Amino acid sequence: MPAKMHSNYPSDSETAELRDSTESGYVSGGSSEEYLPEIVFTKPHLQFLNRQLQFLEPQDVLRWCVTSLPHLYQTTAFGLTGLVIMDMLSKLSIPRPQMVNLIFLDTLHHFPETLKLVDNVRKRYPLQHIHVYKPQGVETEEEFAKKHGERLWEKDDQLYDWIAKVEPAQRAYRELNVHAVLTGRRRSQGGKRGDLDIIEVDEAGLIKINPLANWTFDQVKQYVKENDIPYNELLDKGYKSVGDYHSTSPVKENEDERSGRWKGQAKTECGIHNPRSKYAQYLMDMERKRQEEALSQALQNKLTTA
């Protein structure tokens, strides 16, 4: 039976209901009809697509995505690979049934150079709309610290990732009705990305496409140089991969591209591309408990007034 993917990214409580019927990013035919997809993949179909797409140039992968996947967006922190994807999209010479807009997660802890780059990208690609999502209920780093505590990333990094990145991403997917996203992940970045497929389906049913999965860091840099693409000034100061200022360091020439992220820690991903975090599981459990208590109270009230 074909595997079904949600047409909307579910909320935390909704994901809890779907979790038991989900395996390796696929939702069984018994899951809620509320999330009937516009696209249906079987597992063999997804495997077939990856075998075919891995031999295509990134521009051809993007061309396939734009013409085949509805509600397609690009998620980016404006790293080099994301900038290359953006430039390639702007140059596709095909009738485009949809614009591929950007989703940028402003954690409120980016380097000033990163925010300057966002402005430069807007000027260079004026037709490209950037949807900016911030941690819920705050607009500045000071407000974030006041609400969640100083240096939260040191006290509870999973909670920080959830508040600053994962929840805003999931909120963006729901509000924008995202079905598929382009990411800047590549195999040469190492870590968990070493065996990356071109196209994936995450455990919530979101399609993720990694068009430059086969490219090296040098190939990405060369494209940026040849096409005069604006990039983060920190890359000229020893950085290769840039995230939040508190978890990003310069790297040596022989070090891996992402070795400057969370240096000295076993951590390699911020949570957006990981399975749902323990904190997310905690939130779902708390929501389930709240609903059970509300139901129990409602029944008690009904018995009292009967």
From Swiss-Prot:
<comment type="similarity">
    <text>Belongs to the PAPS reductase family. CysH subfamily.</text>
</comment>
<dbReference type="GO" id="GO:0000103">
    <property type="term" value="P:sulfate assimilation"/>
</dbReference>
<keyword id="KW-0560">Oxidoreductase</keyword>
<keyword id="KW-0028">Amino-acid biosynthesis</keyword>
<keyword id="KW-0486">Methionine biosynthesis</keyword>
<dbReference type="GO" id="GO:0019344">
    <property type="term" value="P:cysteine biosynthetic process"/>
</dbReference>
<dbReference type="Pfam" id="PF01507">
    <property type="entry name" value="PAPS_reduct"/>
</dbReference>
<dbReference type="GO" id="GO:0004604">
    <property type="term" value="F:phosphoadenylyl-sulfate reductase (thioredoxin) activity"/>
</dbReference>
<protein>
    <recommendedName>
        <fullName>Phosphoadenosine phosphosulfate reductase</fullName>
        <ecNumber>1.8.4.8</ecNumber>
    </recommendedName>
</protein>
<dbReference type="GO" id="GO:0019379">
    <property type="term" value="P:sulfate assimilation, phosphoadenylyl sulfate reduction by phosphoadenylyl-sulfate reductase (thioredoxin)"/>
</dbReference>
<dbReference type="InterPro" id="IPR011800">
    <property type="entry name" value="PAPS_reductase_CysH"/>
</dbReference>
<keyword id="KW-0198">Cysteine biosynthesis</keyword>
<dbReference type="InterPro" id="IPR004511">
    <property type="entry name" value="PAPS/APS_Rdtase"/>
</dbReference>
<dbReference type="GO" id="GO:0070814">
    <property type="term" value="P:hydrogen sulfide biosynthetic process"/>
</dbReference>
<feature type="region of interest" description="Disordered">
    <location>
        <begin position="1"/>
        <end position="30"/>
    </location>
</feature>
<feature type="region of interest" description="Disordered">
    <location>
        <begin position="245"/>
        <end position="266"/>
    </location>
</feature>
<comment type="pathway">
    <text>Sulfur metabolism; hydrogen sulfide biosynthesis; sulfite from sulfate: step 3/3.</text>
</comment>
<dbReference type="GO" id="GO:0009086">
    <property type="term" value="P:methionine biosynthetic process"/>
</dbReference>
<dbReference type="InterPro" id="IPR002500">
    <property type="entry name" value="PAPS_reduct_dom"/>
</dbReference>
<comment type="function">
    <text>The NADP dependent reduction of PAPS into sulfite involves thioredoxin which probably plays the role of a thiol carrier.</text>
</comment>
<keyword id="KW-0521">NADP</keyword>
<dbReference type="InterPro" id="IPR014729">
    <property type="entry name" value="Rossmann-like_a/b/a_fold"/>
</dbReference>
